[in-house]
Amino acid sequence: MNFLDYNKNDNFNCYINKTQYVDCYLNNYGLCIKKNKIKNTLLHKVREQLTVKPIANLGSELESYEIFYEDENYIVLPKFLKPIKVIDGVNEYFINFNIKKYKFKHKTININFKGELRDYQNNIILYVMDLFKNSVNKPKGGIIKLTCGGGKTILAIAIACMLGLKTLVLVHKEFLLDQWKDRIQAFSNATVGIIRQKVFQTDFDIVIGMIHSISAIDYDQDVLNEFGLVIIDEVHHLGSRMFSKTLLKTSAEYTIGLSATPERQDGMMKVVHNWIGDIIYQMKKKCDYRVLIKKIYFKSNDKLLFKEKKRWINGDLRPNHTKMIENLALIKSRNNLMIKLIDSLKSMGRKILILSSRIEHLNIIKSGVDKLIK
């Protein structure tokens, strides 16, 4: 694959000061570096830093994976990659990436926004567009953090209309695909296509793509390069080993991530930030004083289930939180207390939503509540 329109007369250098600079192109693939223009020692450090390993269950490590791409001639790095800190014995230095050329290929579109935005949404759009305008020859993108119900979808559609670039929307659930299609058709005059498994409808203004499909299937990369704007809904999901492959294929000139909770317990949010950018706007959540959170203290005498469980992880005996949570859900006296609380709330005529991370636990609670109803 030819990542660069490389001219042999271009002077691409790697020079040393306190910071070691590496020249690169920024284009549809990311930060592209010709491998014969970077020292092997630096190339090794870059590969090392961009091979990540998720953390799970308080210290246990999962399989590592790469968040860069390379072939015989080029290495492609995340477009928002910050200077890499290297500690080599007693020496410490940074590898910084100098964008020598900025070159994107994409298609333009002419679509209009038909909705009406709230004042705070208009303010966000003005802020984001101004940020893009001032990012000359720099990566353009970032994450917009809004609470659930904050109008992330409508806001993103409005930005797509203003930029006037062929747009790809990435989602990880079928219902989100349907929701985005409905919203795009309701709030703009854009034509809408779908990328999902064998369906590859790209001759449209806005295309909605399933992350599962794009990460697993090698679609025509030249067609994917036509998108000038990529919007990622629930962007925090793209930090995983499988989903992060999507980032290597969809690095457009403009990238916008949307999330109410841009966090990951496995530490892999850094993967998302490297490719999509940092949080560029976040709305502070207003405190709802109508909500009462009440703690219920419970003491269990169940010596079989209510005790610490451990397992071996990398040669160390560590707490097995997964097993302990499973056991908590099986303590009969605890579940009976919950059922009695639900029954008392039911008698007040309230609608009740019960949440649990275990389906088996919900089945136990439902069975107990059903007996009370009968």
Regions found by a protein language model. Give the residues of each.
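Walker A/P-loop
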Residues: 134-161
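Interdomain "pre-motor" coupling segment immediately N-terminal to P-loop NTPase/helicase cores
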Residues: 45-102
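Conserved RecA-like ASCE P-loop NTPase motor core of nucleic-acid helicases/translocases
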Residues: 166-173, 350-358
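Conserved helix-turn-beta segment of the N-terminal RecA-like "Helicase ATP-binding" lobe
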Residues: 175-199, 370-374
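Conserved interdomain hinge at the start of the Helicase C-terminal
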Residues: 160, 315-357, 363-368
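Conserved helix/coil segment N-terminal to the catalytic DExD/H
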Residues: 196-229, 240-245
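Post-DEXD/H (motif II) to motif III coupling segment of the RecA-like Helicase ATP-binding lobe
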Residues: 228-229, 236-299
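N-terminal pre-P-loop "Q-motif" helix
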Residues: 114-140
